[in-house]
Amino acid sequence: MTSLFPHQKAKALKPNSRRPAKELCSECGLCDTYYIHYVKEACAFITQQIDTLEEQAHQRSRNLDNPDELYFGVHQDMIAAKKQQPIAGAQWTGIVSSIAIEMLNHGLVEGVVCVQNSKEDRFQPMPVIARTPEEILAARVNKPTLSPNLSILEQVEKSGMKRLLVIGVGCQIQALRAVEKKLGLEKLYVLGTPCVDNVTRAGLQKFLETTSRSPETVVHYEFMQDFRIHFKHEDGSIEKVPFFGLKTNQLKDVFAPSCMSCFDYVNSLADLVVGYMGAPFGWQWILVRNDTGKEMLDLVQNQLDTQPVMSEGNRQEAVQQGISAYDKGVTLPMWVAKIMGVVIDKIGPKGLEYARFSIDSHFTRNYLFVKRNHPEKLAAHVPEFAKRIVGQYKLPE
């Protein structure tokens, strides 16, 4: 049998071996397959090429003079939504799971790449190709640790599947788009989630033990629009910890270096993005990037309550103050942090302005990280849209 592609002669890296991106590796899984053949072009942390891949995925790159596209990328539509009948046990209301199930049930795809957890550890990601609704539901709830989603790409090619849905985050999707034409698929659908600040499993443990009152019972957590981290516990209770009460001086080294050098918070290359940060509290935020994304969303439209996105407040002063506070590792007493959280929740940015606040805060932090730790990569690694966003603020040296 003759190989169609040179990657089929390549060999995956062995577990725990040094990765081509070195300390910036996000463990996306590409190097765990023979697609490592393309790693120099595909890896988001070796070759940043969001604008080129936007053209490939959406037939155009973002308009940098359009304020919404500058921040949120190419899109046809942007709405807030929630399921009329939420899926039990879902992190939000279950929109991502519902779309995946409908695509499978309608025969649009033969499999769904998603992430379950290992039987031994609910926070240990286990990528799978789901072929039934039950297998999709077993993957509900975000996994806050680095996850090798693309490690199953060899299985996809060898299975003979021709129509596939991949659910993933920005760094995974950049690598996926870079090798998309080598997968032998007739149709690839990409459902993305926004993503920042993932951790290793050990880093997650440190974060939980430093921040939660009961780290051993945390089921999942999220940094929410009310400026608090919401920890959901096994008994169903929600623990809320204000952002401003985080022990920043102890947590600076927790987040993965890849996440500290990432500028694709909003998953620019997915067909459809489902998150929460641009929506009012209790709603999810949906970005339809292209016609394929619209096709996916249309499958569940009758299951959703929707409303237009909104924007309120001004983020810029809070972002500027936060740059210095984070850089100095300032930690407030919890009683002060709680008061600040209440006040900022009342008068602070909401909706799309909260999303811009979060993007600005992370991009300025990440720009400084790259500048200080990988200055030789700064010019090429930071996309033009991120440079414009960061350029609004005064940064420390």
UniProtKB/Swiss-Prot annotation:
What start and end residues bound the annotated signal peptide? none
Q: What's the name of the protein?
A: Uncharacterized protein all1601
Q: Name one GO molecular function term.
A: oxidoreductase activity, acting on CH or CH2 groups, with an iron-sulfur protein as acceptor
Q: What Pfam families does UniProt report for this protein, alphabetically?
A: FrhB_FdhB_C, FrhB_FdhB_N
Q: Which InterPro entries does the protein's record reference?
A: Co_F420_Hydgase/DH_bsu_N (IPR007516), FRHB/FDHB/HCAR-like (IPR045220), FrhB_FdhB_C (IPR007525)
The protein's superkingdom reads Bacteria
| Species per Swiss-Prot/TrEMBL record | Nostoc sp. (strain PCC 7120 / SAG 25.82 / UTEX 2576)
Q: What PANTHER family does the database record attribute to this sequence? A: 7-HYDROXYMETHYL CHLOROPHYLL A REDUCTASE, CHLOROPLASTIC
